[in-house]
Regions:
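Cyclophilin-like peptidyl-prolyl cis-trans isomerases
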Residues: 1-246
């Protein structure tokens, strides 16, 4: 079981890395051992949401500089796992948006730790419906992309009947894919976690969760409350150093 200590001016955070996400685990450990994160900042902090770090450009960055675009020169394939939740204290990989990153590949170095909030059963029920609709739309859009040439040809031929039939076919395939993959479904355990501990359930299946805080969750709580500028960068630099926990 791999653990890493993150030292900050507000205290230490110990994170445990999941074996269920081996690519993210091994990459994070490699960077820690290389000292990649030492001297970098928690450069993006949003109260009741999360704290983000890992941008190499944040080392010795002048006050007020906008951060968040630095990277390690590579990305990682997503390692989604329905049992690994965006609960409070979850360690997750940051990434670029779906528009430029439809495969939802992770940043090679930037990460965030979830804070979030607790949800009522009614809120979770409503959120589950929204997540399912998002999942359906995502699957449908992917199928449309695969049939783009066919669709363009039908449009050129003004084949309205064919287009309507194809739309119905793709909608059925999207529903089947969502059901098969279990997308947009919130388990009883997830509902319990988000109602009791809290987190950011709307990010499940969107970003890779690859670890969790084992010690120092109170430190995460302190960091998410600090004052920030218009770019969500803390007004006082929060430098980190990371070491392996034996």
């Amino acid at each position: 079981m791999s653990k890493v200590n993150i030292s900050t001016p507000l205290g230490d955070i110990v994170v445990r890395l999941y074996d269920e996400t081996p690519s993210h685990r091994d990459n994070f450990l490699k960077l820690v051992k290389e000292g990649f994160y030492d001297g970098t900042l928690f450069h993006r902090v949003i109260k009741d949401f999360m704290i983000q770090g890992g941008d190499p450009e944040s080392k010795d960055a002048p006050k007020g500089k906008a951060l968040g675009t630095g990277d390690a020169g590579y990305t990682l394939p997503a390692e989604f796992n329905p049992s690994l939740l965006h609960k409070r204290g979850a360690l997750c990989a940051a990434r670029q948006g779906d528009q430029v990153n439809p495969e939802r590949r992770s940043s090679g170095c930037q990460f965030y730790i979830v804070w979030g909030k607790t949800y009522s059963s009614g809120q979770l029920g409503q959120l589950a419906k929204q997540l399912q609709m998002q999942a359906l739309q995502g699957e449908f859009n992917a199928l449309v992309g695969e049939r783009r040439e066919q669709i363009m040809q039908m449009r050129r031929n003004r084949d309205q009947a064919g287009l309507l039939a194809l739309q119905e076919e793709l909608e059925a395939l999207a529903h089947a894919a969502v059901a098969q993959k279990g997308l947009g479904r919130m388990s009883d355990e997830a509902k319990r976690v988000y109602s009791e501990l809290g987190g950011t359930p709307f990010l499940d299946g969107q970003y890779t969760v690859f670890g969790e805080v084992e010690k120092g969750l109170d430190v995460v709580g302190k960091i998410q409350e600090v004052s920030t500028d218009a770019n969500d960068r803390p007004l006082k630099d929060l430098k980190m150093t990371m070491t392996m926990v034996e």
